[in-house]
Amino acid sequence: GTEGAADVTLKGVVNLKGTESGTEIVVSPLRRESVVLQVYDKSGREIAERRTDWSPGKPFRMEVPVSPDSLGRVMASGVELWTGRDKTLSRPMVAPGDFNWETAYGQWVRGQYLVWLRNYAEAEPFARKSIGYDPCYVPGLNLMSVLLLNRNDCQGAFDCSMRALAVDTYDAQANYLMGCAAMRLGRTDDAMDGFEIAALTNEYRSAACTQLAKLYVRDGQYAEGVQYARKSLIGNAYNIEGLKMLYMASDCLSEDAEAVLSAIENCDPLNDFVRFERYWADPDEKNRTAFQSLIRNEMAVQNYLELAIWYYSIGQVGRAEKVLSMSPGDAETAYWRAYLSQDRELLEKADVSDVSFVFPFREESVPVFEWAMKESGNWRSAYLLALVH
C-alpha cells in the first residue's frame, strides 16, 4: 500500500515519503491506464517525468532527488494528484449565533441535513416541526414527502406533495415527489403530470424524463419511451438509468441498440444489466457465464433480485423471471418467482424455504408478501413483510 495518504483523487491515493536521497512518491491507482507522471518544484520547474502503466492493487513508486518541502506539484497526464499549496477553505463551520432555529426554515435545515446523512428517522421530527410552524411551508412539505416515501407511505407522501402544489403548482421538487408517489400508487396520469412539470426545470429534467420513459415503456408506448430517454440524457450524458431505458425502448421497437449497451459499459464496466441483455439477445453458454461470473460479492442474490425487480417495474416480466431463475436464491427470491408467475407450486416451495439471514428491505417486495399471505397464509410471508416495515 501507500503507507499513508497525502491526497486522494479520482485517479488514486497518493503519499509522499521523505528518504535519505529525496522523496518517494507512492500512488495506489484506482483504475487501469497509461499515464505520464510529472513532478514540479515550488517554482513550477519540472524536475522529473515518467511514463508508466497503472493497475489497481499495484502501487506505483517513484523517487525524486528533492525533499518533500521543496515539492510543488505532482501531475498524472494533466490531472493534479498532489499539491503543496495550502488548500484550507474559507467555508464557515459555525452557524450565526443570532440565527433562529425555531422557525419553519430552521427546522427544515436541520431535517434536510439529516436526510443528506441518511438519518431518516432522526430527520422526521424536524420535518414535522417545520410544517408545524407553517403548515404551508413548501420546502417542509417536500421534506416530509421524501421521508414518507422512504418508509413506503406513498399515500402520505402524495398528500404532502399535493398540499405543496396547492401553494405553488410549479414547484419542481413537489411535482417530482408527487410523480414518484403517484407512480407507486398506480396513478399513472398523476405521475406523468408531475414529472412533465418537473421536467421543465434544469434540476429535475433528467430524473423526470427518466421516470417518464419508464412509464411509457411500461405502458407499451416504446416510441415515446425512446424520446423521453433521449431527453433524459441532455445535460446528463452519464445517466445510466436513462441509457438503460433508451436501450429497453429501442430493443422493444426491434432497433439495434448495441451502441447504447457499449455506452453503459464504458460508464459502468461491472453493470449487470449490460451482460444480461447480451445473454437475453443470444442465450448461449458463453453469454450466460459472462453474466454470472462477475457477480461475486458476498450477497450475490441481491444483484439478481435488484435487476429482476427493475425489469418488473417496467413491465418486462419475462426478463425478470429469467434473471431470478439464474439466482442462487433465498426465501425472498422464492416468493418473487411465485408472484411473477402466479404459480401455486412455486408458492408452496417458497412457504417451506429457509428464512434465516433473509432481511428484505425493498418496498417493491411488499405486494409480493401481501399476495403470498392472502394465497397461503404461511407465517414466513408475514414474517418477511414485517421485516420490510
Q: Where are these predicted regions, by residue range?
A:
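Structural marker of alpha-solenoid helical repeat scaffolds
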Residues: 133, 167, 201, 235, ...
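TPR alpha-solenoid repeat register
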Residues: 140, 174, 208, 242, ...
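Long, contiguous interaction/recruitment modules in multidomain scaffold/adaptor proteins
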Residues: 2-102, 274, 283-284, 346-348
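Structural signature of tandem alpha-helical TPR/SEL1-like repeats
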Residues: 118-125, 150-163, 184-197, 219-231, ...
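Alpha-helical segment of the N-proximal tetratricopeptide repeat
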Residues: 100-133, 303-314, 355-360, 384, ...
